[in-house]
Amino acid sequence: MQNFEDVEVVDGEPVAASLIPRAVTAGELLFDDGATQTFDVNGDTSYVEADGRPTQGKWYVDEDGRFCSFWPPTYRACYDLRWIVEGDEIVGLSFTELGRGTRFDGRYTTRARRPRRRSPARNS
């Protein structure tokens, strides 16, 4: 998973359009219903239902800077994308479908590792 140590956000803050590709491709997301989803940098996405049924689609950032997805043959939707933050750690993304208001919260299945801070050397 990508490291977000340079991203300063709070829980519920919208994901800036410039960060959407990084946010969605950072790692696999696990949703509340047990489904998982991955996003590739080439625009492909794979959604796997809790029962194991996979669906392939496409994702993109539209001209208004919104996250959108397309599921063949005809389903297209755009979402308000927000960070899920616990403490000082980005742990997932919240997708709210525009127009319908349906919300899906996905948590990264692996967390970004922050570098350990070394203690200052102690002089005796």
Predicted regions and their residues:
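Lipid interaction determinants
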Residues: 1-58, 62-124
